[in-house]
């Protein structure tokens, strides 16, 4: 396996990086640590469309080349991580709808989501069902030719700004996880309430509570079962688990980008800052910290690349969990080390690196905590579950 980018991939990366540095980085400086609105987000997302973001390929963008998808995610996350998250979630919703929705619904929604005319979200987590998705309590009841949905979701990315929500709900509690179905809720036609959750980091990547009170959707808004090529409705829970694997790989790659941003800021600083008559990079302990940061980033990137490649071949639960666990924890470690390299200056908000730490810390929780990832890996390696 060649661990270096090929010529086409390098050219894409270099062109994308040039565009992001010139056009998007100033926007991150202005809005990256502020609450995002739909009105502000849509023009920003539209800027990314020529580069393959927010398309119906979903989290693993990049067409036939998953490494291009890795490059896209890392570069945008290193530049404007909040926008990277919003783009990934919207494209994930578009991907689900494109693959499993009624053809009429797919024709109506996929293009607007892909063109950033609409923002999407995927609503799974609930107040009593975080790391354990089998505990979903939101109910969907059939009434004639439509469904009525009641329940609450929490910690939903894009939830407060989403026009389109893909919501997991229970249709038959007696069936357990086999009763789960995904429903597409168009907020313009079936309104629901939401509330922004204030967080320490990724403030421009909305995180929300969502409330569904007698929300009606037509039968055609149920995902799955519309042709022999589409996922059976009975497989909704397996689809949910597969979604988690894709999201974990994407979250891992976001972490790589954030870690790289912190590293680059610190690397520049230690080559300029002088103490005891020389640049601080020439002090052994500082040089060691720089080496550790670079190694952590490379290791995390390789794990994420492997997960992206594996997901293109099918289910890759272990690879995705390894990537998510290692990359997010590495990002926290790298950002903290970057602050240490810069001393008191690392604590100043004007130097940006402290936000890298706050942003990185946000990523160890979603899509299953670090501890849940380790349990998933352990179960796969031994065949024995430490969860149940």
Each language-model region and where it sits:
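Glycine-rich beta->alpha junctions and the first turn(s) of the following alpha-helix
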Residues: 3-5, 193-298, 363, 388
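C-terminal helix-coil-helix/basic helical segment that borders enzyme active sites and/or dimer interfaces
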Residues: 25-35, 267, 271-278, 294-326, ...
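Glycine-rich phosphate/cofactor-binding loops in nucleotide/flavin-utilizing enzymes
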Residues: 2, 71-72, 92, 233, ...
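N-terminal glycine-rich flavin-associated loop
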Residues: 84-104, 130
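Amphipathic, small/basic residue-rich leader segments at the start of a protein or domain
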Residues: 1-88, 108, 112-115, 381-388
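A short, Trp-centered hydrophobic/proline-enriched beta-strand micro-motif
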Residues: 116-125, 168
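A structural signal for short hydrophobic beta-strand segments in well-ordered beta-sheet cores
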Residues: 138-141
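A short core secondary-structure module
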Residues: 145, 150-195
């Amino acid at each position: 396996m060649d661990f270096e980018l090929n010529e086409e991939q390098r050219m894409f990366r270099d062109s994308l990086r040039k565009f992001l540095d010139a056009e998007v980085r100033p926007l991150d400086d202005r809005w990256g640590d502020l609450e995002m609105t739909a009105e502000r987000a849509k023009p920003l997302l539209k800027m990314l469309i020529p580069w393959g973001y927010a398309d119906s390929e979903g989290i693993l963008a990049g067409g036939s080349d998953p490494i291009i998808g890795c490059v896209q995610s890392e570069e945008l996350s290193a530049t404007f991580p909040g926008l990277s998250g919003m783009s990934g979630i919207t494209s994930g919703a578009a991907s689900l709808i494109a693959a499993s929705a009624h053809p009429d619904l797919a024709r109506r929604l996929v293009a607007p989501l892909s063109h950033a005319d609409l923002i999407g979200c995927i609503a799974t987590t609930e107040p009593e069902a975080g790391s354990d998705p089998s505990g979903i309590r939101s109910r969907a009841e059939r009434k004639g030719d439509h469904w009525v949905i009641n329940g609450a979701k929490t910690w939903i990315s894009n939830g407060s700004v989403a026009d389109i929500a893909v919501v997991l709900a229970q249709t038959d509690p007696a069936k357990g996880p086999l009763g789960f179905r995904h429903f597409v809720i168009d907020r313009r036609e079936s309104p629901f309430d939401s509330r922004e959750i204030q967080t320490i980091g990724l403030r421009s990547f909305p995180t929300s509570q969502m409330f569904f009170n007698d929300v009606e959707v037509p039968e055609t808004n149920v995902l799955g079962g519309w042709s022999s090529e589409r996922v059976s409705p009975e497989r909704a829970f397996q689809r949910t688990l597969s979604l988690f694997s894709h999201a974990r790989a994407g979250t891992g790659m976001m972490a790589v980008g954030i870690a790289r941003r912190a590293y680059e800021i610190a690397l520049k600083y230690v080559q300029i800052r002088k103490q005891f008559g020389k640049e601080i990079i020439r002090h052994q302990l500082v040089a060691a910290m720089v080496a550790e940061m670079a190694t952590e980033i490379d290791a995390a990137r390789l794990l994420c690349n492997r997960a992206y490649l594996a997901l293109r071949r099918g289910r890759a639960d272990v690879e995705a969990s390894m990537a998510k666990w290692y990359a997010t924890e590495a990002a926290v470690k790298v950002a903290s080390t970057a602050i240490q390299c810069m001393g008191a200056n690392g604590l100043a908000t004007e130097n940006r690196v402290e936000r890298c730490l706050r942003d990185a810390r946000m990523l160890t929780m979603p899509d299953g905590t670090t501890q849940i990832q380790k349990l998933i890996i352990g179960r796969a390696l031994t065949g024995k579950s430490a969860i149940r």
